[in-house]
């Protein structure tokens, strides 16, 4: 099965040996996206809602480059640093997925960047 590497312009360089997304058989696998700028610095430090918005906008950009959109997302893997941020994250998340929401799970973890409050990885069928 051939795969296509998705490297959208403007996304930060990966922090490890991975790519922002791969596409195979019309399925796009988006790597865990952190709230990072083009220099891999965390944006909106301390603001879970703004970080969530940044992450979802990045995922939207990646999916667009793969020929899809957020409407094509079938599963999200959500990693958050603190359960106290869960309501703010969900409020923003609901704006991006108002109807026909994808399946998801959400777990509390330590993230690779200490100031990051959220990371989301997605699967989309385009």
Curated annotation (Swiss-Prot):
InterPro entries: RutC, RutC-like_sf, YjgF/YER057c/UK114. It holds the Pfam family Ribonuc_L-PSP. GO terms for cellular component: cytosol. This is 3-aminoacrylate deaminase RutC. It comes from the Bacteria. Disulfide bonds: none annotated. One of its GO terms (molecular function) is deaminase activity. It catalyses: (Z)-3-aminoacrylate + H2O + H(+) = 3-oxopropanoate + NH4(+). It comes from Acinetobacter baylyi (strain ATCC 33305 / BD413 / ADP1). Its EC number is 3.5.-.-. GO terms for biological process: nitrogen utilization; uracil catabolic process. Involved in pyrimidine catabolism. Catalyzes the deamination of 3-aminoacrylate to malonic semialdehyde, a reaction that can also occur spontaneously. RutC may facilitate the reaction and modulate the metabolic fitness, rather than catalyzing essential functions. Belongs to the RutC family. Keywords: Hydrolase.
